Amino acid sequence: MAEKAHYERTKPHVNIGTIGHVDHGKTTLTAAITKMLADKGLAEAQDYANIDAAPEERERGITINTAHVEYETENRHYAHIDAPGHADYVKNMITGAAQMDGAILVVAATDGPMPQTREHILLAHQVGVDYIIVFLNKTDLVDDDELTDLVEMEVRELLSEYDFPGDDIPVIRGSALGALNGNPDDVKAVEELMATVDEYVPTPERDTDKPFLMPVEDVFTITGRGTVASGRIDRGQVTVGDEVEIIGLKEEIAKTTVTGLEMFRKTLDQGQAGDNIGALLRGIDRESIERGQVLAKPGSIQTHKNFKGEVYILSKDEGGRHTPFFSNYRPQFFFHTTDVTGVIELPEGVEMVMPGDNVTFTVELISPVAIEKGLKFTVREGGRTVGAGVVSEIID
């Protein structure tokens, strides 16, 4: 009997998703990818209905329907996100529990780019999805190749408009439905698509390799030993003896050394991304550190007061506001572990924002906070969530 290949859990992990206009074939393509890989023994085939009936999830108080599919190629393990409705997409990309490392933009060759195509490209740009691969779908329904060429040109121009390298982005042509039905040419196109995703979307840097960052959740004193800051390490790692900075809420940055670490009441030499730890800090008194600040590798993150955010405002049904808001609205912005009041300025030509809208606006915080592009936040009013967003640009 032939020896079975040993399953190794060593493949790098990448998050991707399908984006694009409604009915252009995102979900059919997702199903076709799983079928093609299942035939190679690398995935479980998921049928269309299965993916389309996405379960509801609550992410930061917002209800989103999202389908999570996982599969492997020869080189990688993928988590693939597909959201059925347009509103689900918008919410998912802004609040996204899963940050996409890359996206497959599905455009029907029969229609060309449509309003949601544009909106999804804009969102991908705003929330920091750096890599897009295009799948021109339904090419079997277009008689003239020149028409398909025109659609490809339009898509490339649209991508360039939002700062993606439109001329260089890989474009694959095929039919997702054909692939699902086993048509060899279309199956080949889906194989080519996944080979391209493997190659074009770089493996993301692992969280543990990034510079150390831990939002402070709690501070307490151990008599005779000093001050301990506790929290969950967001990224990177920290070792006893490391120098760290205490950043945020105050203009000045304090430097200190980690003299001890503990987790689950046991001492620890090193903490890493995902660990809930307490860090004993040398020469820091109880008053000079507070919840909402961060501990960070020196020089790795700065505080800012002004930023642009891409934000989804909850609808009334989602427990959000019942009325619109205008420029100079002053809610709280919840970053890391604390609320900071900020003043909103709407972009030119936008009079007001209605519940259920997504919008880009500028914020001036009343205290400096350790923030960077891509950081997620919630907008709150009197303790309840009225919006969720992501920092799209730092303004100094």
Swiss-Prot record:
- Note whether Lyase occurs among the keywords: no
According to the entry, what is the taxonomic lineage of the organism? Bacteria, Bacillati, Bacillota, Bacilli, Lactobacillales
Organism listed in the record? Latilactobacillus sakei subsp. sakei (strain 23K)
The GO cellular component terms are: cytosol
Compartments (UniProt record): Cytoplasm
Which principal EC class is assigned to this enzyme?
hydrolase
Q: Where is this region: G4?
A: 137-140
Put simply, this protein is called Elongation factor Tu
For this chain, the family text in UniProt reads: Belongs to the TRAFAC class translation factor GTPase superfamily. Classic translation factor GTPase family. EF-Tu/EF-1A subfamily.
Task: Please tell me whether the keyword tRNA processing is annotated for this protein.
Answer: no
Pfam families under this entry? Answer: GTP_EFTU, GTP_EFTU_D2, GTP_EFTU_D3
Entry's Gene Ontology molecular function annotations: GTP binding; GTPase activity; translation elongation factor activity
Summarize the subunit comment. Monomer.
The UniProt annotation places GTP binding at 20-27, 82-86, 137-140
